[in-house]
């Protein structure tokens, strides 16, 4: 008799969870809760990043800003630090431009300062990789960088590079 009681209780608990899950799915149209689970990935099309449909506004804005300078500007040391709109950008100037577009920084930052920007570790949507000599960002699964991309100057790549030797940083607020 004790065994049957335990089985009945377990089935009742399982039924409650099933009803709760079905109700939650119906309330959201069958989609997952925003912010739950893995984030979408941007697509690369003709040298520009296309944001995923589930990307937060700050991420979309950062991608759009990066697209403004991707492969349309040359690389130059110090580029993008004197003013936001520049003829050329260096690595940290390009990353800063994208972060500024997403309203995550107010002023351009050199790579050494990006090592200390935001919070430690990888972000859900944007991770900045920085050391004293170089910086790049991974935004919605695509790498925005001034090296190891097609062409010259800032650009996107779906090929990742090693993060070894870089500090990993992310925006310190929920995007």
What are these regions (language model features)?
Residues 63, 96-175:
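...with weaker cross-activation on analogous glycine-rich loops/strands in unrelated enzymes
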Residues 76, 88-91, 125, 130:
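Generic recognition of cysteine residues
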Residues 83-102:
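Active-site nucleophilic cysteine motif
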Residues 77-89, 156-159:
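Short, polar loop/linker segments at the starts of domains and inter-domain junctions
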Residues 75-76, 104:
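Secondary-structure boundary/capping residues
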Residues 44-48, 77-83, 113-115:
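Short linear capping/connector segments at secondary-structure termini
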Residues 2-75, 150, 154-175:
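Intrinsically disordered, low-complexity
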């Amino acid at each position: 008799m004790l065994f049957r009681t335990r089985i009945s209780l377990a089935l009742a608990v399982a039924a409650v969870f099933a009803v709760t899950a079905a109700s939650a799915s119906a309330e959201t149209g069958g989609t997952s809760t925003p912010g739950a689970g893995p984030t979408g990935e941007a697509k690369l099309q003709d040298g520009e990043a296309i944001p995923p449909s589930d990307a937060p506004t700050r991420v979309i804005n950062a991608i759009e800003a990066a697209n403004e300078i991707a492969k349309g500007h040359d690389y130059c040391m110090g580029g993008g630090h004197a003013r936001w709109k520049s003829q050329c950008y260096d690595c940290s100037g390009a990353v800063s431009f994208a972060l500024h577009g997403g309203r995550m920084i107010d002023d351009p930052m050199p790579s050494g300062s990006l090592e200390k920007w935001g919070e430690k570790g990888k972000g859900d949507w944007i991770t900045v990789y920085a050391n004293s000599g170089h910086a790049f960002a991974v935004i919605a699964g695509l790498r925005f960088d001034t090296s190891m991309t097609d062409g010259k100057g800032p650009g996107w790549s779906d090929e990742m590079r090693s993060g070894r030797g870089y500090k990993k940083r992310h925006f310190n607020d929920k995007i």
